[in-house]
Design a protein with these regions (language model features):
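RNase H-like two-metal-ion nuclease catalytic core shared by retroviral integrases
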Residues: 133-135, 139-145, 154-177, 184-196
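Active-site beta-loop-alpha junctions of metal-dependent nucleic acid enzymes
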Residues: 76, 80, 97-122
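Short, structured coil segments at secondary-structure junctions
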Residues: 147-149
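Conserved short alpha-helical interface segments
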Residues: 1-41
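C-terminal domain-tail junction helix/linker
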Residues: 179-229
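Mobile-element integrase/transposase regions
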Residues: 24-84
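Short small-residue beta-strand/loop micro-motif enriched in glycine and branched aliphatics
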Residues: 93-98, 154, 179
């Protein structure tokens, strides 16, 4: 398999600041899992799409690959600056991070378009079968991906435990990018280096294999499919 398929630099888009993006695999030691105290679920005042209550149980059970959780990691909260868009594949623990110019819907959607081009238009909905997001306004356009065959679900407000894997991965990223430190201080290459270190760690829950190894096997299966569409 061509390993570069998993973490190639995203192409620069003409006339915008996305040149510093990089598609990056992250993963983390399961031993660092923190217990989340569940809170009372509040009513959702915003409706960006399908609720997580309608998500098939098979996705939570991690029976198959291709189901993701999405989030953003911010630096300084004041002012406009870059953030990191992160996704974790639930079965393999494979983590993707993309540096984007801001915490807004347009930046998120351009990043997802980069991913669609990266993995291939014909295979995008096979690699990304579903994505579960929170109700942040940066994900307000995420349901547009359903046009490509991706199922989009939204967690309840103030219910981070419904995306526990992504939350855990983001906490590990904070070892490298502490809270309050600007994302602009880190290049795409530095973020990739952080990711490579974490990605190389075997996991007990994965049979002492790495997320990268398992995700590459998943991609091999996807790209071996005969898709006539």
């Amino acid at each position: 398999m061509n390993r570069s398929r998993c973490h190639r630099k995203a192409k620069a888009l003409n006339g915008n600041p996305f040149v510093d993006w990089v598609i990056t695999p992250f993963n983390l030691p399961e031993a660092l899992l923190r217990r989340h105290k569940k809170k009372l679920i509040r009513n959702n005042k915003r409706s960006y799409g399908t609720s997580i209550t309608e998500r098939p149980e098979e996705i939570s059970a991690e029976i198959e690959e291709g189901h993701w959780e999405i989030d953003t990691v911010v630096g300084k909260r004041a002012g406009k600056e870059s953030v990191v868009l992160t996704l974790v594949e639930k079965k393999t623990d494979y983590y993707i991070a993309i540096k984007i110019p801001g915490k807004d819907a347009a930046s998120v959607m351009i990043a997802m378009e980069v991913l669609r081009e990266e993995y291939g238009d014909k295979f995008f909905s096979k690699v990304f079968k579903s994505i579960t997001a929170d109700n942040g306004s940066e994900f307000s356009r995420l349901s547009e991906l359903e046009a490509y065959g991706v199922s989009i679900y939204f967690a309840h407000p103030y219910s981070s435990w419904e995306r526990a894997q992504n939350e855990r991965h983001n906490r590990i990223l904070r070892r490298y990018i502490p809270k309050g430190v600007s994302i602009d201080l880190y290049s795409a290459e530095q973020i990739l280096h952080f990711a490579d270190e974490m990605n190389a760690l075997p996991r007990k829950q994965l049979g002492y294999r790495t997320p990268e190894e398992l995700f590459e096997k998943f991609l091999d299966k996807v790209y071996s499919l005969k898709i006539f569409k």
